[in-house]
């Protein structure tokens, strides 16, 4: 049994116009196998070669090479490696009345097979390889393993190039993890309860929005190397602008109110009502406490009127001095 065909034979195209001219100028059913015998695909140890040599030196075998039917009929009585025509375009288009059902093509199919005789049973035929002839060009049909291997290699090559390109795309953010595209912000639904209280009066930007904006700015600065310094300056100015506009605002659902040491948790609506209803308290004047000391016989500097007991004492003292 012949070995497996060489893989390099699948890449060969063979043609010989001089041999076609020697065989009558065109290929037909009776000379197609002899034209194939001139190609490198032919095996000189096959039954075809031995039968052709016998016909050249033995007149009894001459009629076997005159027609393809007689040649292949003789090959069926032999055991071993052989080449037979699997598809004849002329026979495929011929009809019993001698006319053609369609225009015959110029494609022939030849099989390389091994025949083994079995007593009382049909011959065991194993197909080793297939060849096809288009015009005067002979090709070897690729095996199934070669076709599947080529497709797998093409797929792996494409996946390798894809992974090389995709390896530079992922970005990481604490809120979304590893992503290939910047995360899109979800629009808040005003109809849902609780969303109104979570929104700031001045539309405070969300942390994800700042992260997405900074990520886009960083990506653009890496792509455009010439304008990196200008982009950095613009980013810094935007940061200061956001700090100036929203630096004193918070997104706490229950903000802290009160003085240091006595903070109280309250809701946003309660805080607004309290601040709107309560007028601003005026700061009390802080000064040194005054203590009044009354000296006997001396009137207060501010001219304050003494009390009743003090007036009686003063009168008694004046009476004693007068007496």
Curated annotation (Swiss-Prot):
Residues 189-203 have a biased composition (Polar residues). Component of the Mediator complex. This is Mediator of RNA polymerase II transcription subunit 6. One of its GO terms (biological process) is regulation of transcription by RNA polymerase II. It comes from Aspergillus niger (strain ATCC MYA-4892 / CBS 513.88 / FGSC A1513). Residues 172-213, 271-323 are annotated as: Disordered. Keywords: Activator, Nucleus, Transcription, Transcription regulation. The keyword Lipoprotein does not apply. Belongs to the Mediator complex subunit 6 family. Residues 276-285 have a biased composition (Low complexity). Component of the Mediator complex, a coactivator involved in the regulated transcription of nearly all RNA polymerase II-dependent genes. Mediator functions as a bridge to convey information from gene-specific regulatory proteins to the basal RNA polymerase II transcription machinery. Mediator is recruited to promoters by direct interactions with regulatory proteins and serves as a scaffold for the assembly of a functional preinitiation complex with RNA polymerase II and the general transcription factors. Pfam families: Med6. The keyword Nucleus applies.
């Amino acid at each position: 049994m012949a070995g497996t065909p060489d893989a390099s034979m699948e890449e060969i195209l063979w043609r010989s116009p001089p041999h076609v001219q020697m065989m009558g100028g065109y290929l037909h059913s009776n000379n197609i196998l002899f034209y194939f015998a001139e190609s490198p695909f032919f095996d000189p140890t096959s039954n075809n070669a031995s039968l052709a040599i016998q016909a050249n030196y033995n007149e009894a075998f001459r009629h076997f090479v005159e027609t393809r039917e007689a040649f292949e009929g003789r090959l069926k009585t032999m055991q071993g490696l052989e080449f037979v025509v699997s598809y004849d375009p002329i026979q495929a288009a011929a009809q019993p009345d001698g006319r053609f059902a369609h225009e015959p093509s110029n494609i022939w199919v030849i099989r390389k097979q091994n025949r083994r005789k079995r007593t009382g049973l049909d011959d065991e035929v194993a197909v080793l390889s297939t060849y096809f002839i288009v015009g005067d060009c002979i090709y070897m049909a690729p095996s199934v393993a070669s076709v599947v291997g080529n497709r797998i290699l093409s797929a792996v090559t494409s996946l390798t190039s894809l992974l090389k390109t995709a390896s530079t795309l992922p970005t990481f953010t604490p809120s979304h993890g590893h992503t290939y595209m910047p995360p899109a912000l979800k629009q808040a639904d005003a109809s849902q309860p609780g969303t109104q209280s979570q929104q700031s009066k001045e539309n405070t930007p969300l942390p994800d929005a700042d992260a997405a904006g900074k990520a886009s700015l960083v990506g653009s600065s890496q792509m455009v190397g010439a304008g990196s310094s200008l982009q950095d300056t613009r980013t810094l100015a935007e940061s200061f602008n956001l700090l100036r506009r929203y630096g004193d605002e918070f997104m706490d659902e229950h903000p802290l109110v009160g003085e240091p040491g006595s903070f109280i948790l309250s809701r946003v609506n309660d805080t607004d009502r309290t601040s709107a209803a309560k007028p601003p308290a005026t700061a009390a004047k802080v000064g040194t406490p005054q203590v009044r000391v009354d000296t006997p016989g001396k009137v207060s500097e501010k001219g304050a009127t003494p009390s009743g007991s003090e007036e009686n004492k003063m009168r008694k003292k004046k009476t004693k001095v007068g007496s």
